[in-house]
Protein backbone atom coordinates (compact mmCIF):
# COMPACT_ATOMS: atom_id res chain seq x y z
CA UNK A 1 0.00 0.00 0.00
CA UNK A 2 1.28 3.48 -0.88
CA UNK A 3 2.08 5.64 2.17
CA UNK A 4 -0.39 8.28 0.94
CA UNK A 5 -3.27 5.79 0.85
CA UNK A 6 -3.52 5.84 4.64
CA UNK A 7 -3.66 9.63 4.91
CA UNK A 8 -7.00 11.48 5.00
CA UNK A 9 -7.79 13.96 2.24
CA UNK A 10 -7.34 17.14 4.38
CA UNK A 11 -3.76 16.13 5.21
CA UNK A 12 -2.99 15.47 1.54
CA UNK A 13 -4.41 18.89 0.62
CA UNK A 14 -2.29 20.49 3.36
CA UNK A 15 0.80 18.81 1.88
CA UNK A 16 -0.16 20.09 -1.57
CA UNK A 17 -0.47 23.60 -0.13
CA UNK A 18 3.08 23.29 1.17
CA UNK A 19 4.23 22.32 -2.35
CA UNK A 20 2.47 25.37 -3.80
CA UNK A 21 4.16 25.42 -7.21
CA UNK A 22 1.42 25.22 -9.85
CA UNK A 23 3.43 23.31 -12.47
CA UNK A 24 4.48 20.70 -9.90
CA UNK A 25 0.90 20.32 -8.67
CA UNK A 26 -0.41 19.82 -12.20
CA UNK A 27 2.14 17.04 -12.68
CA UNK A 28 1.00 15.49 -9.39
CA UNK A 29 -2.57 15.42 -10.65
CA UNK A 30 -1.57 12.82 -13.25
CA UNK A 31 -0.28 10.37 -10.62
CA UNK A 32 -3.66 8.93 -9.67
CA UNK A 33 -7.39 9.56 -9.65
CA UNK A 34 -7.15 10.62 -6.02
CA UNK A 35 -4.48 13.22 -6.68
CA UNK A 36 -6.39 14.38 -9.74
CA UNK A 37 -9.37 15.15 -7.50
CA UNK A 38 -7.36 16.70 -4.63
CA UNK A 39 -4.93 18.96 -6.51
CA UNK A 40 -7.70 21.41 -7.58
CA UNK A 41 -8.49 21.91 -3.88
CA UNK A 42 -5.08 23.51 -3.20
CA UNK A 43 -5.56 26.90 -1.55
CA UNK A 44 -2.04 28.41 -1.57
CA UNK A 45 -0.40 28.55 -4.99
CA UNK A 46 2.77 29.93 -6.57
CA UNK A 47 2.52 30.52 -10.31
CA UNK A 48 5.80 31.09 -12.16
CA UNK A 49 5.36 32.63 -15.60
CA UNK A 50 7.56 33.24 -18.62
CA UNK A 51 6.89 36.42 -20.54
CA UNK A 52 7.95 38.39 -23.57
CA UNK A 53 8.71 42.11 -23.53
CA UNK A 54 8.35 44.97 -25.97
CA UNK A 55 9.50 48.57 -26.11
CA UNK A 56 6.80 51.15 -25.47
CA UNK A 57 7.21 54.54 -27.21
CA UNK A 58 4.54 56.04 -24.95
CA UNK A 59 7.11 57.52 -22.57
CA UNK A 60 7.95 60.47 -24.83
CA UNK A 61 4.33 61.61 -25.12
CA UNK A 62 3.87 61.09 -21.38
CA UNK A 63 6.71 63.49 -20.67
CA UNK A 64 5.17 66.13 -22.90
CA UNK A 65 1.55 65.82 -21.84
CA UNK A 66 1.39 64.76 -18.21
CA UNK A 67 3.64 67.18 -16.37
CA UNK A 68 2.48 70.78 -16.17
CA UNK A 69 5.32 73.27 -16.26
CA UNK A 70 8.09 70.77 -17.02
CA UNK A 71 7.99 70.60 -20.81
CA UNK A 72 11.20 72.58 -21.28
CA UNK A 73 13.08 70.28 -18.93
CA UNK A 74 11.83 67.12 -20.60
CA UNK A 75 11.91 68.11 -24.26
CA UNK A 76 14.66 65.68 -25.22
CA UNK A 77 13.15 62.37 -26.45
CA UNK A 78 13.46 59.57 -23.95
CA UNK A 79 14.40 55.97 -24.57
CA UNK A 80 11.45 53.57 -24.90
CA UNK A 81 10.30 51.83 -21.75
CA UNK A 82 10.31 48.04 -21.73
CA UNK A 83 7.10 46.51 -20.39
CA UNK A 84 5.59 43.06 -19.97
CA UNK A 85 3.37 41.87 -22.84
CA UNK A 86 2.23 38.52 -21.48
CA UNK A 87 -1.39 37.76 -22.34
CA UNK A 88 -3.86 37.63 -19.41
CA UNK A 89 -5.33 34.47 -20.96
CA UNK A 90 -2.20 32.48 -20.04
CA UNK A 91 -2.48 32.63 -16.21
CA UNK A 92 -6.26 32.33 -16.60
CA UNK A 93 -5.92 29.03 -18.49
CA UNK A 94 -3.20 27.63 -16.23
CA UNK A 95 -5.23 28.28 -13.08
CA UNK A 96 -8.53 27.04 -14.53
CA UNK A 97 -7.91 23.61 -12.93
CA UNK A 98 -8.01 25.08 -9.43
CA UNK A 99 -11.25 26.02 -7.69
CA UNK A 100 -10.32 26.91 -4.09
CA UNK A 101 -7.47 29.40 -4.42
CA UNK A 102 -7.17 31.67 -1.38
CA UNK A 103 -3.57 32.89 -1.55
CA UNK A 104 -1.88 33.38 -4.91
CA UNK A 105 1.75 34.35 -5.50
CA UNK A 106 2.77 35.06 -9.09
CA UNK A 107 6.42 35.25 -10.14
CA UNK A 108 7.75 36.69 -13.40
CA UNK A 109 11.27 35.75 -14.57
CA UNK A 110 12.75 39.26 -14.60
CA UNK A 111 12.17 42.91 -13.83
CA UNK A 112 10.45 45.36 -16.19
CA UNK A 113 12.56 48.48 -15.66
CA UNK A 114 15.68 48.54 -17.83
CA UNK A 115 18.44 50.81 -16.50
CA UNK A 116 22.05 51.71 -17.09
CA UNK A 117 24.63 49.44 -15.47
CA UNK A 118 24.85 49.90 -11.71
CA UNK A 119 21.47 51.61 -11.35
CA UNK A 120 18.58 50.03 -9.47
CA UNK A 121 14.87 50.65 -9.03
CA UNK A 122 12.71 48.88 -6.47
CA UNK A 123 9.01 49.49 -6.02
CA UNK A 124 5.87 48.22 -4.32
CA UNK A 125 2.36 49.05 -5.53
CA UNK A 126 -1.06 48.30 -4.07
CA UNK A 127 -4.12 47.99 -6.29
CA UNK A 128 -7.88 47.65 -6.02
CA UNK A 129 -9.89 48.44 -9.14
CA UNK A 130 -7.02 50.82 -9.91
CA UNK A 131 -3.79 52.08 -8.31
CA UNK A 132 -4.03 52.83 -4.58
CA UNK A 133 -0.38 53.62 -3.87
CA UNK A 134 3.14 53.03 -5.14
CA UNK A 135 6.45 53.52 -3.33
CA UNK A 136 9.61 53.70 -5.44
CA UNK A 137 13.25 53.71 -4.31
CA UNK A 138 15.97 54.16 -6.93
CA UNK A 139 19.63 55.07 -7.23
CA UNK A 140 22.20 55.45 -10.01
CA UNK A 141 25.00 53.48 -8.34
CA UNK A 142 26.01 52.00 -4.97
CA UNK A 143 29.41 51.86 -3.27
CA UNK A 144 31.00 51.87 0.15
CA UNK A 145 32.23 54.72 2.34
CA UNK A 146 34.72 54.66 5.19
CA UNK A 147 32.47 56.45 7.66
CA UNK A 148 28.74 57.28 7.52
CA UNK A 149 27.66 60.89 7.71
CA UNK A 150 24.34 62.64 8.12
CA UNK A 151 22.12 63.07 5.07
CA UNK A 152 21.94 66.59 3.69
CA UNK A 153 19.24 68.16 1.57
CA UNK A 154 19.63 69.19 -2.05
CA UNK A 155 19.71 72.47 -3.89
CA UNK A 156 17.18 73.43 -6.56
CA UNK A 157 19.88 73.05 -9.22
CA UNK A 158 20.63 69.50 -8.12
CA UNK A 159 16.94 68.65 -8.23
CA UNK A 160 16.51 69.98 -11.77
CA UNK A 161 19.65 68.23 -13.06
CA UNK A 162 18.39 64.76 -12.24
CA UNK A 163 14.67 65.38 -12.68
CA UNK A 164 14.32 63.68 -16.05
CA UNK A 165 15.98 60.48 -14.81
CA UNK A 166 13.77 60.41 -11.73
CA UNK A 167 10.65 60.88 -13.85
CA UNK A 168 11.73 58.00 -16.12
CA UNK A 169 12.19 55.77 -13.07
CA UNK A 170 8.73 56.72 -11.78
CA UNK A 171 6.88 56.21 -15.06
CA UNK A 172 8.70 52.92 -15.66
CA UNK A 173 7.60 51.60 -12.27
CA UNK A 174 3.98 52.74 -12.74
CA UNK A 175 3.76 51.18 -16.20
CA UNK A 176 5.25 47.92 -14.93
CA UNK A 177 2.81 47.86 -12.00
CA UNK A 178 -0.24 48.58 -14.18
CA UNK A 179 0.85 45.87 -16.66
CA UNK A 180 0.94 43.30 -13.86
CA UNK A 181 -2.45 44.42 -12.56
CA UNK A 182 -3.90 43.99 -16.06
CA UNK A 183 -2.31 40.56 -16.38
CA UNK A 184 -4.29 39.13 -13.45
CA UNK A 185 -7.68 40.81 -13.97
CA UNK A 186 -9.34 37.76 -15.52
CA UNK A 187 -8.00 35.47 -12.81
CA UNK A 188 -9.24 37.75 -10.01
CA UNK A 189 -12.73 38.02 -11.48
CA UNK A 190 -13.04 34.29 -12.19
CA UNK A 191 -11.67 33.05 -8.86
CA UNK A 192 -13.84 34.89 -6.35
CA UNK A 193 -12.35 32.86 -3.50
CA UNK A 194 -8.93 34.56 -3.77
CA UNK A 195 -8.21 36.66 -0.65
CA UNK A 196 -4.59 37.67 -1.29
CA UNK A 197 -2.63 38.26 -4.49
CA UNK A 198 1.07 39.09 -4.69
CA UNK A 199 2.95 39.57 -7.97
CA UNK A 200 6.70 39.92 -8.08
CA UNK A 201 9.61 39.21 -10.39
CA UNK A 202 12.45 36.80 -9.70
CA UNK A 203 14.84 39.74 -9.21
CA UNK A 204 12.47 41.24 -6.59
CA UNK A 205 12.53 44.54 -8.46
CA UNK A 206 8.83 45.26 -8.22
CA UNK A 207 5.87 43.94 -6.23
CA UNK A 208 2.13 44.33 -6.79
CA UNK A 209 -0.17 43.44 -3.90
CA UNK A 210 -3.95 43.17 -3.68
CA UNK A 211 -5.64 42.46 -0.36
CA UNK A 212 -9.13 41.05 0.13
CA UNK A 213 -10.77 44.48 0.02
CA UNK A 214 -8.93 45.47 -3.17
CA UNK A 215 -9.82 42.16 -4.86
CA UNK A 216 -13.52 42.63 -4.08
CA UNK A 217 -13.34 46.20 -5.37
CA UNK A 218 -11.95 45.01 -8.73
CA UNK A 219 -14.57 42.27 -9.08
CA UNK A 220 -17.48 44.58 -8.29
CA UNK A 221 -16.45 47.49 -10.52
CA UNK A 222 -17.51 47.80 -14.13
CA UNK A 223 -15.01 49.81 -16.17
CA UNK A 224 -16.21 52.61 -18.42
CA UNK A 225 -16.17 51.71 -22.12
CA UNK A 226 -13.52 54.31 -22.98
CA UNK A 227 -11.29 53.13 -20.12
CA UNK A 228 -11.67 49.50 -21.18
CA UNK A 229 -10.66 50.41 -24.73
CA UNK A 230 -7.48 52.06 -23.41
CA UNK A 231 -6.73 49.02 -21.26
CA UNK A 232 -7.03 46.56 -24.14
CA UNK A 233 -5.01 48.77 -26.48
CA UNK A 234 -2.16 49.40 -24.04
CA UNK A 235 -2.23 45.93 -22.42
CA UNK A 236 -2.15 47.47 -18.96
CA UNK A 237 -4.56 49.03 -16.49
CA UNK A 238 -5.14 52.78 -16.67
CA UNK A 239 -2.95 54.74 -14.26
CA UNK A 240 -5.17 57.42 -12.66
CA UNK A 241 -4.17 61.03 -12.15
CA UNK A 242 -1.70 60.97 -9.28
CA UNK A 243 0.12 63.16 -6.78
CA UNK A 244 3.76 62.36 -6.13
CA UNK A 245 6.02 63.20 -3.21
CA UNK A 246 9.59 63.05 -4.53
CA UNK A 247 12.70 63.17 -2.33
CA UNK A 248 16.22 63.04 -3.70
CA UNK A 249 19.80 63.05 -2.42
CA UNK A 250 22.74 63.47 -4.84
CA UNK A 251 24.82 61.28 -2.53
CA UNK A 252 23.16 59.34 0.27
CA UNK A 253 25.51 57.87 2.86
CA UNK A 254 23.88 55.20 5.00
CA UNK A 255 24.84 54.14 8.51
CA UNK A 256 25.65 50.68 7.17
CA UNK A 257 28.55 52.17 5.19
CA UNK A 258 26.84 52.06 1.79
CA UNK A 259 26.79 55.18 -0.38
CA UNK A 260 23.98 55.58 -2.93
CA UNK A 261 24.49 58.07 -5.75
CA UNK A 262 21.43 59.98 -6.98
CA UNK A 263 19.15 58.24 -4.48
CA UNK A 264 15.43 58.87 -4.92
CA UNK A 265 12.24 58.09 -3.01
CA UNK A 266 8.89 58.62 -4.74
CA UNK A 267 5.52 58.09 -3.05
CA UNK A 268 2.59 57.98 -5.46
CA UNK A 269 -1.12 58.23 -4.63
CA UNK A 270 -4.26 58.92 -6.71
CA UNK A 271 -5.04 62.64 -6.85
CA UNK A 272 -8.35 62.28 -5.02
CA UNK A 273 -7.02 60.16 -2.16
CA UNK A 274 -7.23 61.50 1.39
CA UNK A 275 -4.15 61.11 3.55
CA UNK A 276 -2.43 62.79 6.49
CA UNK A 277 0.97 64.50 6.34
CA UNK A 278 2.62 61.71 8.34
CA UNK A 279 1.24 58.97 6.09
CA UNK A 280 4.21 59.23 3.70
CA UNK A 281 6.60 57.87 6.31
CA UNK A 282 4.30 55.03 7.34
CA UNK A 283 3.55 53.95 3.76
CA UNK A 284 7.19 54.10 2.64
CA UNK A 285 8.68 52.30 5.64
CA UNK A 286 6.05 49.54 5.53
CA UNK A 287 6.73 48.98 1.81
CA UNK A 288 10.37 48.06 2.48
CA UNK A 289 10.23 46.66 6.02
CA UNK A 290 12.80 43.89 6.43
CA UNK A 291 14.72 44.99 3.31
CA UNK A 292 17.95 46.16 4.92
CA UNK A 293 19.55 48.56 2.40
CA UNK A 294 16.32 49.83 0.83
CA UNK A 295 14.63 50.18 4.21
CA UNK A 296 17.57 52.18 5.52
CA UNK A 297 17.55 54.34 2.39
CA UNK A 298 13.84 55.09 2.87
CA UNK A 299 14.38 56.26 6.45
CA UNK A 300 17.25 58.51 5.35
CA UNK A 301 15.45 59.95 2.30
CA UNK A 302 12.37 60.82 4.35
CA UNK A 303 14.57 63.46 6.02
CA UNK A 304 15.26 65.15 2.67
CA UNK A 305 13.33 68.01 1.11
CA UNK A 306 10.01 66.93 -0.41
CA UNK A 307 9.04 68.07 -3.91
CA UNK A 308 5.43 67.65 -5.05
CA UNK A 309 4.45 66.76 -8.62
CA UNK A 310 1.15 65.93 -10.29
CA UNK A 311 0.65 63.65 -13.26
CA UNK A 312 -2.41 63.15 -15.43
CA UNK A 313 -3.95 59.75 -16.09
CA UNK A 314 -2.27 57.64 -18.79
UniProtKB/Swiss-Prot annotation:
Residues 1-49 form the F-box domain. The keyword Protein biosynthesis does not apply. Pathway: Protein modification; protein ubiquitination. It holds the Pfam family F-box. It is found in: Nucleus. Keywords: Nucleus, Ubl conjugation pathway. GO terms for cellular component: nucleus; plasmodesma. It comes from Arabidopsis thaliana. Disulfide bonds: none annotated. Part of a SCF (ASK-cullin-F-box) protein ligase complex. Component of SCF(ASK-cullin-F-box) E3 ubiquitin ligase complexes, which may mediate the ubiquitination and subsequent proteasomal degradation of target proteins. PANTHER family: OS05G0510400 PROTEIN-RELATED. InterPro entries: AUF1-like, F-box-like_dom_sf, F-box_dom. Transmembrane segments: none annotated. Its main location: nucleus. The F-box is necessary for the interaction with ASK proteins. The keyword Cell division does not apply. This is F-box protein AUF2. Induction: Not induced by auxin. GO terms for biological process: cellular response to hypoxia; protein ubiquitination.
Amino acid sequence: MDVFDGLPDPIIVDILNKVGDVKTLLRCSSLSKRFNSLVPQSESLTLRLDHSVSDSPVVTSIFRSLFNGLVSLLSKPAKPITITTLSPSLPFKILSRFDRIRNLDVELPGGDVKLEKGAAVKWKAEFGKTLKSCVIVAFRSAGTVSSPVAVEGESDAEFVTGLKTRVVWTISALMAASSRHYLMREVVKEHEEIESLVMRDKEREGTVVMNEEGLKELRNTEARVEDEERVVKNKRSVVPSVRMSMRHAPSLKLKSGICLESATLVIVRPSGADFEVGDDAELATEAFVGDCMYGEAVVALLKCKKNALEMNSF
